[in-house]
């Protein structure tokens, strides 16, 4: 089990993505009320840590690609992410 600490922006995006279905970047931006640059930067940090995956797969998502890309939580870290959100 991994001890995950999330920043406020990261926790907001993890809650918005949820644990069931992938969510499009445009929906994430609308739901979180964050700037597109902030959403993209935060998603890239979560993706580099392996906590979030993009569909289609990207190592790093660009600002122009973010709204039309789907994002989902990595199922291998789902339990750890739930605990990280619970501790907040």
Segments and roles (model prediction):
Residues 16-20:
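Short helix-capping/hinge SLiMs at alpha-helix to coil transitions
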Residues 22-31:
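Short acidic, hydrophobic short linear motifs in intrinsically disordered regions
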Residues 33-49, 54:
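Short amphipathic alpha-helical interaction segments
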Residues 56-68:
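Short, Lys/Arg-rich nucleic-acid/phosphate-binding segment
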Residues 1-13:
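Short alpha-helical segments that sit at the start of domains
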Residues 1-2, 30, 69:
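Residues marking the start of alpha-helices
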Residues 68-88:
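Short, amphipathic alpha-helical interaction segments positioned at domain boundaries
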């Amino acid at each position: 089990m991994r001890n995950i600490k999330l920043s406020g922006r990261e926790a907001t995006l993890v809650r918005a993505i949820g644990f069931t279905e992938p969510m499009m970047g445009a929906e994430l931006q609308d739901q979180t009320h964050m700037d597109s640059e902030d959403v993209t930067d935060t998603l890239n940090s979560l993706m580099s840590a392996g906590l979030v995956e993009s569909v289609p797969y990207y190592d790093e998502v660009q600002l122009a690609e973010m709204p039309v890309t789907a994002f989902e939580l990595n199922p291998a870290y789902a339990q750890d992410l739930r605990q990280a959100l619970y501790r907040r």
